[in-house]
Amino acid sequence: MSVKIDKRAYAEMFGPTVGDRMRLADTELWLEVEKDYTIYGEEVKFGGGKVIRDGMGQGQGVASEVADTVITNALIVDHWGIVKADIGIKGGYISAIGKAGNPDIQPGVEIAIGAGTEVIAGEGMIVTAGGIDTHIHFICPQQIEEALMSGVTTMIGGGTGPATGTFATTCTPGPWHIHRMLQSADAFPMNLGFLGKGNASLPQPLREQVEAGVVGLKLHEDWGTTPAAIDNCLSIAEEMDVQVAIHSDTLNESGFVETTLGAFKGRTIHTFHTEGAGGGHAPDIIRAAGYPNVLPSSTNPTRPFTINTIDEHLDMLMVCHHLDPAIAEDVAFAESRIRRETIAAEDILHDLGAFAMMSSDSQAMGRVGEVVIRTWQTAHKMKVQRGPLPEDSARNDNFRIKRYIAKYTINPALTHGIAHVVGSIEVGKLADLVLWRPAFFGVKPSTILKGGMIAAAVMGDANASIPTPQPVHYRSMFGSYGGALQTSVTFVSQAALQNPEVAALQLKKPLVAVKGTRGVKKADMVHNGWMPEIDVDPETYEVRADGMVLSCEPAEILPLAQRYFLF
């Protein structure tokens, strides 16, 4: 016997369905459910008197026939769609996206539930892929917990701890340091990959770092990003299938932006903080965002442009790059990098899909726990200032939402050759998933899964009689301890998997090789492949893209900010 219920009652019981709209936290962004893979009247839900009970929504299949975990009635927000579905997890990987239940009595079941299945209630929750931050200065290990609690599940960068070189550059230099960092990676519930130092004009110093296990090489101006170093580094990358990231020559000592672009010779490269405040040819490194072989990203301090952005950056830059405020030349160096015109243009270039990625620049002119927040603050600011995108309607901002979520999920995964494992909610990928209450979307996740196991969550008093009493705060869960850390992976080069020195380290976490980094182009950046011709006026710093002036006002107030934080 069937019964009809109204839309509000249905949404409260099973979460939103097709045509329902939802506001993302306190932003002006609205999503609309595009498709519902569950079957009306056959939805599964756990609890007393609910569906997932023996002989009802739970069948008799043995462990090999059923999911290890099912997230029920989840609202998936990913680059490929905004849909309602059950998510099946098996062996730490996403096994199915569709309809869960008991195939013995229910139609259309793609995810079998049995006695061996755990359930996570996704009703009324948003589920996203774990974030990927590709600009990490590994200055302190506490960054990893901070990032995890913000919804980031993969970190790529370089460093060796609070060393002077690491304060300024994302490089783990040389085989000895690389091996020590690989060993350290075993201790953390985070997918990790390390970048070697790419500043060398001969091949062997770079080749040996790739063989030691780095996933890419970083060219940084503080080590000397000369045309010779760029050319040599990209040559090794082409030979060994790893990515190159670059922080180019702010002072234009060894050439101008045209010189650096010429040294690329059409080869793929990831340009960090492509606007320039984080470093790069002054004042026009932003031009690189229009080239087909350049994969441009931002770091989060300039995201979005606010009334405080300029003032904050000057002090931040002096500290991070070991500059002396008593030396006039050092002050001039800092001031040359901070330009309100290019920072404002960066907002718009993100909104139009010319900048493809977002990252942090952790503790080195960036905040490791704010990649997700700053992404959605930028999207909100652009919605308020520029209105709906042409691809959207008055009803929803679905395309804008897909464009922005791609900036910290699938696009960094594609760029660094790890999209076969992470970066989206798709069958066959690692179950790195983040659950959000809609009112807290983008700012405070509820539950973070690593490889199918809960690694972190909001949790109340451990001595309470129920899980919810205050103080409620983020705590590490069982997926963050002991052998369960193997639900995370360590990314390495293909050459490292063949290296007996790496095998001798006896690393505990699975090693996964990066691949396909050299064939990725700007056109492959999902929802973010626009390649305009960008010009910067050398006198006024006015930015134009295909002749259009890119200018916007700084924000005076933002969502996802003080409303959500005591400190």
From Swiss-Prot:
Its EC number is 3.5.1.5. Residues 130-567 form the Urease domain. Carboxylation allows a single lysine to coordinate two nickel ions. Its cofactor is Ni cation. One of its GO terms (biological process) is urea catabolic process. It is found in: Cytoplasm. InterPro entries: Amidohydro-rel, Metal-dep_hydrolase_composite, Metal_Hydrolase, Urease_alpha_N_dom, Urease_alpha_subunit, Urease_AS, Urease_asu, Urease_asu_c. It catalyses: urea + 2 H2O + H(+) = hydrogencarbonate + 2 NH4(+). Pfam families: Amidohydro_1, Urease_alpha. Pathway: Nitrogen metabolism; urea degradation; CO(2) and NH(3) from urea (urease route): step 1/1. Binds 2 nickel ions per subunit. SUPFAM superfamilies: Composite domain of metallo-dependent hydrolases (SSF51338), Metallo-dependent hydrolases (SSF51556). Ni(2+) 1 binds at residues 135, 137, 218, 361. GO terms for molecular function: nickel cation binding; urease activity. GO terms for cellular component: cytoplasm. Keywords: Cytoplasm, Hydrolase, Metal-binding, Nickel. Belongs to the metallo-dependent hydrolases superfamily. Urease alpha subunit family. This is Urease subunit alpha.
